[in-house]
Amino acid sequence: MNIHEYQGKGILKQFGVAVPKGIVAFSAEEAKQAAAELFEEQSSPVVVVKAQIHAGGRGKAGGVKLAKSPEEVYEIAQKMLGTTLVTHQTGPEGKEVRRLLIEEGMNIDKEFYLGITLDRATSCNVLMVSTEGGMEIEKVAEETPEKLLKIQVNPKYGLQGFQAREAALFLGMQGEQFRNGVKFIDALYKAYTTIDASLAEINPLVVTKEGRVLALDAKINFDDNAMYRHPDFHELRDITEEDPLEYEASKSNLNYVRLDGNVGCMVNGAGLAMGTMDLIQLAGGKPANFLDVGGGASPKTVEEGFKIILGDKNVKAILVNVFGGIVRCDRVAGGVIEAAKNIGLTVPVIVRLEGTNAKEAQKMLDESGLSLIAANGLRDAAEKVQKALASA
């Protein structure tokens, strides 16, 4: 689950992570009042108006503006609220701006990158710091890897003092900045582990001319599998920032990711799902989604999966590709038949079932009286997908 910048900063602040003063606003009038409050409290000649959407690259898209008065903030907020920001992370459809963060201006001296995430290859948390603040960390790692330091942190022992100091020294911090930097890194790691985050990213981490170390931006992603331990975080979810179909899928515990293709796919198992997407591509189509119904696919699960796939109007055909290991093929076939009867399939459906009770499943499909297209093997499935697209 993703949350907004202002929500992430609010959580981090509880753990002692230094963040600028900021106030969220849902209207131009609220933005003006927030700015007036900040100007009264601070000595900075500017405040920052920041669009709150679940995507990076807001500055380049016009989603971050400086203002020198509450009146100017009001004008900016009027123009920004309700507009659609298109960044490299939103896709061409963009995201509508529904809320703003009004934040105190900073007297910035240096900008850095700081992030913590899980390294699955080593089963450790990894602390990453870079002198290239404000840049995409993937780009830094590829083009200037010498400017990026990765420190493996064993979750059994946690972040050690020498590791936090190593990171601060790599960034060139000295004196008061160094002490504040080490304190900041310690606090961020504590927050990351306590809230079961999958990512805690500060980009940029800034050092002011006064020696303060603060999170100018914050991105927090939660591990969905640990959300039961943090019921209070559920209220932070902003479903308007999520794809409606992905949100519906999450309510049915389906692993669904919407793509921009024309062939829907329903598969059991992530590996087979990715292989199926390659198969669709080779057949001349483009996958419209990733959908893993899991090992315990039931008729109800299959029906919900079909509803979600058909919610994408770009879908011209559907490929069901199931290997019956834990789940029986006849059970999946029953779900496909039931779904076809209940929701009225309007596009060709190619069904390839292999494994436990595959013959029984094939017989059920043949005797269903429905226009379901059975496939024998992957090659046959690919050819039938190709044929379905040609006639669509």
UniProtKB/Swiss-Prot annotation:
Pathway: Carbohydrate metabolism; tricarboxylic acid cycle; succinate from succinyl-CoA (ligase route): step 1/1. It comes from the Bacteria. Mg(2+) binds at residues 203, 217. It catalyses: succinate + ATP + CoA = succinyl-CoA + ADP + phosphate; GTP + succinate + CoA = succinyl-CoA + GDP + phosphate. Its EC number is 6.2.1.5. GO terms for molecular function: ATP binding; magnesium ion binding; succinate-CoA ligase (ADP-forming) activity; succinate-CoA ligase (GDP-forming) activity. It holds the Pfam family ATP-grasp_2. Keywords: ATP-binding, Ligase, Magnesium, Metal-binding, Nucleotide-binding, Tricarboxylic acid cycle. Its cofactor is Mg(2+). Heterotetramer of two alpha and two beta subunits. Belongs to the succinate/malate CoA ligase beta subunit family. PANTHER family: SUCCINATE--COA LIGASE [GDP-FORMING] SUBUNIT BETA, MITOCHONDRIAL (PTHR11815:SF10), SUCCINYL-COA SYNTHETASE BETA CHAIN (PTHR11815). Succinyl-CoA synthetase functions in the citric acid cycle (TCA), coupling the hydrolysis of succinyl-CoA to the synthesis of either ATP or GTP and thus represents the only step of substrate-level phosphorylation in the TCA. The beta subunit provides nucleotide specificity of the enzyme and binds the substrate succinate, while the binding sites for coenzyme A and phosphate are found in the alpha subunit. This is Succinate--CoA ligase [ADP-forming] subunit beta. It comes from Chlorobaculum parvum (strain DSM 263 / NCIMB 8327). The lineage of its organism: Bacteria, Pseudomonadati, Chlorobiota, Chlorobiia, Chlorobiales. The gene is sucC.
